[in-house]
């Protein structure tokens, strides 16, 4: 089972403050573990334009039709001072890894320098921090009914309003998560 380019959808019973009602986009999953970005937990009072200001990046030439007031996500509890940018191709940046045909993760400054310009990738999600699972840990959490999984959907990843992503991700597999009981059992 490889969950790269899938969503982890927190079950209603998952009460961890960071992962409660979260949707995690899995960027890498192999025999050594998994790494992902939470895509529905906006950081308070932090937008893309604020990140650019802090890093002293001025988009030039600025394209005023591109919004920089999008929220920055809490990507996870690890390395919360590091930026991770999920975006659609191209992957021409210094530190990019292609996750799927339509999704790339970049950690280098050069992608930030394109934000607000015509060179910006068409879809962008900026996060600080990431989530990680050791070898076998994610598989055990799945067995423990902590998560549902669904193939990733770019509309949910980039376009669905943040507050609706948890419910919409569950709908991908035919589940209305708001009607699920708080605790699932084993059959």
UniProtKB/Swiss-Prot annotation:
GO terms for cellular component: cytosol. It holds the Pfam family DUF179. SUPFAM superfamilies: VC0467-like. InterPro entries: AlgH-like. Gene3D superfamilies: VC0467-like, VC0467-like domains. HAMAP family: UPF0301. Belongs to the UPF0301 (AlgH) family. This is UPF0301 protein YqgE.
């Amino acid at each position: 089972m490889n969950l790269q380019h899938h969503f982890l959808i927190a079950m209603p019973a998952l009460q961890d403050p960071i992962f409660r009602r979260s949707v995690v986009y899995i960027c890498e999953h192999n025999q050594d573990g998994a790494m992902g970005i939470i895509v529905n937990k906006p950081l308070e009072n932090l937008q893309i334009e604020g990140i650019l200001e802090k890093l002293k990046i001025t988009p030039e030439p600025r394209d005023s039709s591109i919004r920089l007031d999008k929220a920055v996500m809490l990507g996870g509890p690890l390395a919360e001072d590091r930026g991770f940018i999920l975006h659609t191709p191209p992957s021409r940046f210094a530190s990019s890894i292609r996750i799927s045909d339509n999704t790339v993760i970049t950690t280098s400054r050069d992608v930030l320098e394109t934000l607000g310009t015509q060179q910006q990738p068409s879809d962008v999600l900026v996060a600080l921090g990431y989530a990680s699972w050791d070898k076998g840990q994610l598989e055990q959490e799945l067995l423990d009914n902590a998560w549902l999984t669904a193939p990733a959907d770019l509309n949910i990843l980039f376009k669905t309003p943040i507050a609706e992503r948890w419910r919409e991700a569950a709908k991908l597999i035919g589940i209305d998560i708001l009607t699920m009981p708080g605790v699932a059992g084993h059959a």
